[in-house]
């Protein structure tokens, strides 16, 4: 999930 400015791809 994307948190603020940082988007973490769920793999």
Curated annotation (Swiss-Prot):
Localization, UniProt: Secreted
Pfam families: Periviscerokin (PF08259)
Signal listed as a keyword: no
Chief location of this protein within or outside the cell: secreted
Modified residues (Valine amide): 11
GO biological process: neuropeptide signaling pathway
Keyword Oxidoreductase: no
InterPro entries membership: Periviscerokinin
Functional description taken from the UniProt entry: Mediates visceral muscle contractile activity (myotropic activity).
Name of this chain's protein: Periviscerokinin-3
Annotated source species: Mastotermes darwiniensis
């Amino acid at each position: 999930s994307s948190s603020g400015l940082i988007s973490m791809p769920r793999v």
